[in-house]
Amino acid sequence: MLLKKAKPPAYLRWLLLFPVPVVWCVLMQAGLLAFLENRLIDWRFQFRGEISAPVKVVYVDIDSQALSTIGGFPWSRMYFARVLPALINQAGVKAVGVDIVFSENGVAEAIDWKKRVEGNRELAKYLSKGPPVVTAASYAAPVDRDINGRLVYRSLPLVRYAKLSEPAEPPETPAFRISEIDPNRLWSPGLVGLIDTIDGGTRMAPAYVHTSVRTYFHMSVELARLHFGVKPDGVKIADDHIDFVRENGSLVTRIPLFDRQMIEINWFSPWMAPASNPRISFATVFNYAEMLHSRDAAERKAAEAFFAQPDFKEAIVLIGPVDPLLQDLAATPFDEIPVPKVGVHGNMVKTIVSGLYLQRLPTVANHAIVLGLTVLVSLLAAAGGAKGARTKLTAALLLTAYVYLACKFFQDHHLILPLVAPLGAAFTTSFAAIVWQLILEEKQKGRIKGMFGAYVSPQLVERMVESGENPQLGGHDDEITAYFSDIQSFSSFSEKLGSGPLVELMNEYLTACTDLVQAQGGTLDKYIGDAMVAMFGAPLPLRTTLTGRVWPRSWCT
C-alpha cells in the first residue's frame, strides 16, 4: 500500500499543471504577448508574399530630388495647386490624398508672407471647387494653440476609452492663412482625412473619430469612398462595421471594425515593389504640370504624354514625404528597415477596396486552441515507457503542423491564428510534465531497485520501471517456470573442506549461478544451503518462451 501512495494519481498531476496554460491565456488577453505575436505575424506576411489588389495606387514622392529642386520645407502651396489639377483633370486619377498637414504652426515669421499667402489662396481657390482631394488632419501634435492663443491638448479619441461627458478635441486640421495682415484669417478645406495610426505603427489605424466638432474619417476611408463613388452621407457607422451605401440604398462594401473603431491593415507588398507601388518624384510631376501651359508645343505634347500614362488612369494617388530627413518612417511587416509611412494609407486603401481584411478568431476560440494544443502536446511529451521517444516525436510534429497550418490559413484566408500563447503554453506545460515524470520515474526506479535489485538483473529492473506498474505486494496468479539447482554430493566433499575454502567456493558458485539466471531474465528467489531457487516469468512475463533455451543447469555443474 505504501508504494501506491507514493505515486499521485495522474489526474492530480494534470490538475496542478492546468494553471500554466491559463496564465498564457491571461497574458494573451492582456496584450502582453502582442510584441512577439506581431513578429510572428510579420513572418506570416513574408511566408505569404506579395499579393495583388483591384485598385491602382501611385505614390508621388516628396523625396530628395524634390527637396533639392524646389527647396526645403515648408513649400509654397502653389506647387500643390499646380500638381493636383494636372493629376485629376489631365491624368484622370480618381482621387488624391496629401499626407501632409497644411498647418501654419511653426512657420517662421521671417518668411515672405506675401508669396506664401498667394500660394495659399491659389490652393484654397482650387480646393474650394470640391475636387476629389483629401487633405490631412492629425493628432500628432499633442499640444497646440488656437486662434485666441489658448492651449489645446489633443489625444487620439478611442471609442473603447471614450467618456460621453467629455467630447474629444478635433485633430489639427489644414489651415491656410489668406491674409498678409491678419494672421487669424484662416481658410480650411472641407474634405479632410486622418493620417494617424495606433502608436505610430503600421498595423492598425482608426477608421474614424468622433469629436466635439464633427466626425473625421481616416484618409484611406475617404479615398476608398471616392474610389467607389459614394457620397459623404453614404458612410454609415455601426458598432462593428462601416457601410458604404449608394443613394439608391444599395450596399457597396462593408468595412469590419476591431474594437468598434479600428481597421487592421493587410499589407500587400514591400515598399520597394515597383509593380505594386509605382512611384515618381513630386518634382517630376510638377515640372510636367508646368509644361502643360508652356508656349512650346513640344513641351505641351510631352506633358500630355506623361499624364496619359496608364498607371495614372483611375488610380488613387498619394502625395507624401519619403526623404529620411522628413522623419516620417516606420517598419512594416515586409520591411524591417523603416520605410515611408505614406505606404500605410496605400495598403489600407487596398485592404478596403479589395475586401481582403485580416481576420481573427473570437477570444473563446483562441483560448480553446491554447488549452487544446497544450493538453495534446503535453500528454504526448510526458508519456514514458518504451514508446516515450515515439510519442515525444509525435508531440514535436504536432507543434510543427500547427505552425504550418497557421501560416497556410493566413496565406489562403488572411486568418490570424494565435502562435505565441499556444506554443508557449504547450512548451512550458510539456517541460513541467516531463520534469515531473522524470522525478517520479527516478523515485519508482529507486523503490524497485531497493526491493528487487539483489534478485533480478538490471535489465529486468529497467523493464519493471518502463512498465509503469507498481509491484503487487498482495500477490497474484500467473504462469511461471520454477528453477532449482544444487551441488551433487555436497555433504560428502564439504566435510573434507575447511570453513574458509568452503565459504570461498560457495560464494563463487552461487554468484556464477545467480549471474547466469539473471542473464536469462530469471529472478532469484532464495538460497538454501548449496541450493538456489529461481523463477522465470515473474515479476514480469518473459518476452520470449523458454522453449529451446540452454538451461543454466549446464553452466552450474
Task: Please annotate each region the language model reported.
Residues 362-435:
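Transmembrane alpha-helical segments that form the functional core of multipass membrane systems
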Residues 224, 319, 349, 457, ...:
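Conserved hydrophobic/aromatic pocket- or pore-lining residues that grip, position, or stack substrates
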Residues 419-478, 504:
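Regulatory cytosolic signal-relay segments
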